[in-house]
Amino acid sequence: MERFIKRLSASCESTIHHKVYQIMNEAKTEFEKVLKKLK
């Protein structure tokens, strides 16, 4: 049971990291678009 909980929390953590990574990538892309327009 404890092992299952640990695995569950680990998979939740990696999902959260993946989501944050995706959001940051999207933000970076948008930011670069804006910078290109300003130049």
Curated annotation (Swiss-Prot):
Domain of life: Bacteria
Designated name of the protein: SPbeta prophage-derived uncharacterized protein YorT
Taxonomic classification: Bacteria, Bacillati, Bacillota, Bacilli, Bacillales
Gene that this polypeptide is encoded by: yorT
